[in-house]
Amino acid sequence: FLAMHRHMIDGIRKAFPGHPELFAGFDHVPRGQDDPENPMPWRDVRWSAAQLAAIDKLEHIEDHVDEFATEDELGLYIEVPFRWTPENPSGFVADGSSGLHFMLHAQWSVAGSPVNLGIGENLILNRVFWDLHGWIDTVWERYRVARGLTRDDLEYQEALVGQCEEMHDQLDLRPHAGHAQEDAP
């Protein structure tokens, strides 16, 4: 989850190097309608107490690194509020603070929008998509720094390469025989 989003954000930042502010992410997750960070000030922003606790925890991740033994644990906590298992394919996590990524998408989804954050391939055209994913990426980077991890770590490098290969295969971005590309990924 985290490596896939890092690969995606790094790619978009490289594609638009003159506009880093577009992909920097929220400075903080907006808590209410009047919050200056709220990208849709005409809409009310509502969070449950558990979601606010998750936001506070992640915005102060350096004080909570011991709650996540691994980056995978952090990623699962952020990603979605459900965990699929063969026994319970639609099971939810009992911790209501888990799944903030899912809740961030839901908070600013607009039904019927061609760039709805809830579903669809066009969601990457929505500026808020980059605000929320940039924020998550910053939280992950701060976690890594607090753990003494660097971008030179072999496991980190392998995770990014793996996500790159998977994304390029899924999106069919690899050059095909007879169709060489000078700058192929």
What is the meaning of each model-derived region?
Residues 1-185:
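C-terminal accessory segments of proteins
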